[in-house]
Amino acid sequence: MKKLFLNYFPFIIFFVSCQFNNYETVDKNIRFREKIQTGNFIKLSKGHTYYEIDNQKSLKTLVFIHGFSVPSYIWDDTYYSASEKGYKVLRLDLYGRGYSSNLDIDYTDNLLADQVIELLEELNIKQATLLGLSNGGRVISKIAYLKPELVEKLIYVSASSFQDHNPTENKSVSGKEINNFIKNNYPTISKGQLLDFKYPENFKGWDNKYENLLQYEGFARALISTRKNHVNLDTENSFINGSEIPFYTIWGDSDSAVVYNEFKDKLNKLMPRRKEYFVSESGHLPNMENKEEFENLLFNQILKEN
């Protein structure tokens, strides 16, 4: 029995080694970008940005900002519905996510906000309604603070913009941290995406799409750096509340990723002017899990308000 185990032991090591060697093997360089058959790429000041745009002659523009790790495809349902309704629609992959460049710099809120601002300027979009999902809520808060004239409305969906954060002193990301993150998280991180749903059984295959992201070199570093650079956005959110920008918060009624009750008192103090809505039978992604109710709220109420 011992001899049999020893015979299999090298195979086990080889299998595990191959499994981890499949992670972060793809460099998102020019050859990579040339193979992408959808959307567009544009070179901005910090790197290449992947984006999709439709109905460019429409006067009403919606810009969809994704969350912490899942890129712009997380907005598929709402993006295509808005496009069919005639809105000018724009979505992009933030740096470190999807098809956009993975950078070797700090992933701050300013970096991601500046990316969106630069893209809007390059596309000659003077004003837009910004929709920020989860961590994307942080990005739209920062945009509104830096360039309020760009913003027609702000729509926060399951936004992680309002919690308290303890500043991280050392914001650098070491190779050891990256390797440990890949080793400890990558084997299960895709399956973990299903926890965003109240009824994950209705979204079979959702985790498989995420698996593709794990092959891009620099993804783990982007996630670690983003988390390390999270700071309180009280100043930005207070500014928005005191501005004339209309803003709205939308929550899934069963969100276990961003737990509303943990920060609602702070939110009430920071942004009492907001209009707030809860989508039934949905977790962290109400735009997907209860598409009908979410889109009725978005298109027939929020976007029709003057």
Language-model regions, residue ranges each:
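Conserved alpha/beta-hydrolase catalytic His-Asp/Glu region
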Residues: 166-171, 181-241
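Acidic catalytic loop of the alpha/beta-hydrolase fold
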Residues: 254-258
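Catalytic active-site module of serine/aspartate enzymes centered on a nucleophile-bearing elbow/loop
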Residues: 273-306
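Alpha/beta-hydrolase fold catalytic core
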Residues: 2-60, 84-87, 126, 300-306
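Conserved HGGG/HGGXW glycine-rich cap/lid loop of the alpha/beta-hydrolase fold
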Residues: 54-99
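Active-site loop/oxyanion-hole signature of alpha/beta-hydrolase fold enzymes
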Residues: 45, 91-131
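Short beta-strand/loop motif that positions the catalytic acidic residue
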Residues: 243, 249-251
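Flexible "cap/lid" loop of the alpha/beta hydrolase fold
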Residues: 142-145, 154-184
